[in-house]
């Protein structure tokens, strides 16, 4: 019997959030201001696009943190769900105050 399995979008979003939170320099994730707009948005087949909204730790280098989030999220989604995103967009919405 042949078939395929897919992972629900909310599970992929949870995986992406977990991976992002592990990156040094990420103080947290920022929920959207509109209803049902989470901190992680997944779109396209097999999580082709992932968009994360983060709060950056005070003094953390935004470019380096963003690149590390991109790498870790892509690697983690591929390892856990077999879906490597084509794009991982990291949006810094807030900076944590010391």
Model regions and ranges:
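Short beta-strands and strand-coil junctions in structured, solvent-facing domains, enriched
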Residues: 59-62, 97-98
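Short coil/turn segments at secondary-structure junctions
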Residues: 3-4, 56-60
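Short, non-transmembrane amphipathic alpha-helical segments
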Residues: 62-81
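A short amphipathic beta-strand at an alpha->beta junction
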Residues: 79-98
């Amino acid at each position: 019997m042949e078939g395929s399995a897919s992972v629900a979008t909310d599970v992929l979003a949870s995986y992406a959030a977990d991976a992002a939170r592990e990156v040094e320099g990420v103080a947290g994730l920022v929920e959207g201001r509109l209803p049902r707009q989470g901190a992680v948005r997944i779109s396209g087949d097999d999580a082709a696009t992932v968009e994360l909204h983060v709060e950056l730790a005070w003094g953390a280098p935004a470019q380096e943190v963003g690149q590390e989030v991109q790498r870790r999220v892509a690697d983690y989604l591929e390892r856990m769900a077999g879906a490597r995103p084509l794009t991982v967009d990291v949006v810094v919405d807030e900076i944590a105050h010391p």
